């Protein structure tokens, strides 16, 4: 039984329930099973003979057997172990000293640390929170403008969405059925270019408005070259070698993303051991967080696949596609419109919901407009990175507010 109107009602209920805080994965599954039972209903069938139950079990098996998704828990474990290696403090300190001659050195060191740490973890909230605890108070103490300091931490922390090994790009690749390796290669340059533009802006601001980013006192910048090199050798180079090993193996085809992620996870454990922070407590926390996040992503995929199958069967996907194609949009107009919608969705929703629920609505239309899914995916990542920085619902600002000193107002962070 097909009915596009029922499909649109199904989509409307989904959006409404997500907005009021229902668990997304189980909402998707519940709506998929409920409306699927209606769609596949046959009067002469027993209750559990309905096709929707076969669809649910088949989707569960398919998701759990997806090679692209196997790398997610391994990259997450790598990120959580690096996070618990207590390397961030020494990394930030060494980069701060190494960049001491650069105007706005504290902010530049913060952005460089965020970019490097994002490359090692791919976890946005973790980077913003950790740098909010470490770098934000130091910038305020050094006399930096509160708005500039907050913007640097939030912008730098969001780089993990775009810079490989971004978990978001893996999920997008699984949804769009394209190579994660190609996605990483496509996103690497834009990610570091964006980080470079952030740094250039901070340096320019420090040069022309030094009151907003004062120079550090001489006693904090008086280090011999050998001391700087030793500090970098202890903090920067080990992490850089780990990152280059993982990304290099992926980019040059030496290993698949899953194999490289496994090497990265093992390397992160070795790194934690080298910094004497490998404890039973840290391993247990990292494994628990990895399992929790991985389970969330997997069940989101199961729910999304079930919902999407029923939605398409009812005629909802065909209705949306025919409506959009009937508007006779140019490829550029379609690209701008779709990215604008994704940008608006990035205010109230997490990237997981956007990539798994809403992006697949646009994917079937890309061939008609001759838009490369790789380009579309990189633009989505860049777009969401911007949305997570944009008031009134900038998620990175709320991450920072949670760890910022009490006198720092949310309006100052938004500013």
Residue positions per predicted region:
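Alpha-helical transmembrane segments of multi-pass membrane transport proteins
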Residues: 1-415
């Amino acid at each position: 039984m097909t009915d596009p109107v029922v499909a649109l009602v199904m989509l409307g209920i989904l959006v409404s329930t997500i907005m009021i805080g229902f668990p997304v994965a189980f909402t998707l599954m519940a709506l998929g099973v409920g409306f699927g039972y209606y769609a596949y209903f046959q009067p002469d069938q027993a209750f559990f003979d309905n096709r929707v139950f076969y669809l649910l079990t088949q989707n569960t098996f398919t998701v759990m057997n997806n090679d692209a998704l196997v790398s997610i828990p391994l990259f997450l474990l790598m990120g959580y172990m690096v996070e618990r290696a207590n390397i961030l403090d020494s990394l930030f300190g060494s980069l701060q000293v190494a960049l001491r001659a650069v105007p706005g050195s504290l902010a530049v060191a913060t952005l460089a640390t965020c970019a490097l740490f994002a490359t090692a973890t791919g976890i946005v909230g973790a980077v913003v929170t950790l740098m909010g605890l470490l770098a934000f108070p130091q910038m305020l103490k050094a006399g930096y403008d509160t708005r500039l300091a907050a913007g640097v931490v939030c912008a730098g922390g969001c780089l993990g969405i775009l810079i490989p090994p971004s978990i978001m790009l893996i999920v997008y690749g699984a949804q769009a059925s394209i190579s994660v390796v190609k996605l990483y290669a496509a996103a690497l340059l834009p990610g570091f270019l964006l980080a470079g533009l952030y740094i250039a802006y901070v340096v320019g601001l420090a040069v022309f408005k030094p009151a907003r980013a004062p120079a550090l006192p001489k006693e904090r910048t008086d280090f011999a070259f050998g001391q700087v090199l030793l500090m970098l050798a202890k903090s920067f180079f080990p992490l850089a070698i780990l990152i280059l090993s993982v990304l290099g193996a992926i980019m040059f085809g030496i290993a698949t993303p899953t194999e490289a992620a496994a090497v990265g996870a093992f390397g992160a454990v070795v790194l934690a051991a080298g910094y004497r922070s490998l404890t039973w407590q840290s391993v247990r926390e990292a494994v628990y967080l990895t399992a929790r996040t991985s389970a969330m992503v997997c069940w989101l995929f199961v729910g999304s696949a079930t919902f999407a199958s029923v939605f398409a069967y009812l005629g909802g996907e065909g209705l949306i596609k025919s409506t959009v194609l009937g508007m006779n949009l140019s490829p550029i107009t379609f690209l701008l419109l779709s990215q604008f919608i994704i940008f608006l969705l990035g205010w109230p929703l997490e990237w997981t919901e956007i990539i798994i629920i809403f992006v697949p609505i646009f994917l079937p239309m890309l061939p008609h407009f001759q838009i490369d899914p790789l380009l579309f995916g990189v633009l989505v990542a860049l777009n969401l990175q911007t949305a997570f920085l944009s008031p009134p619902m900038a998620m990175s600002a709320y991450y920072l507010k949670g760890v910022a000193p009490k006198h720092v107002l949310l309006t100052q962070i938004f500013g």
